[in-house]
Amino acid sequence: MLPEKLHNLPHNGKRIFYKFYDRSLRKFGSREVAVKLAVCAVRKKYTLVRGQWRARPDANDADTTSSSSSSETCTESDDSSDVPPARYAV
């Protein structure tokens, strides 16, 4: 279920992915939607730099632990062409 491009994510990045994937799959019942939402959650904390995932400088500004809903937008980055962008509410 983890997209190929995310296999070298740090441990905490993978935890974020799986947490959001599981939550989104239960809520929406779609694996495709769950992957898109989970990738967006990861992108709030990590960015891909020369093939390596790095913590974003503003990573602490994004809360990926909250269970409350807020409208956020995931934007596409140049370095993740095989990971689709998504618009979502988490």
Swiss-Prot record:
Xref: Pfam families: ChaB
Residue ranges of the region described as Disordered: 53-90
Annotated coiled-coil segments of the chain: none
InterPro entries: ChaB, ChaB_sf
Biased composition (Low complexity): 63-74
Protein known as: Uncharacterized 10.2 kDa protein
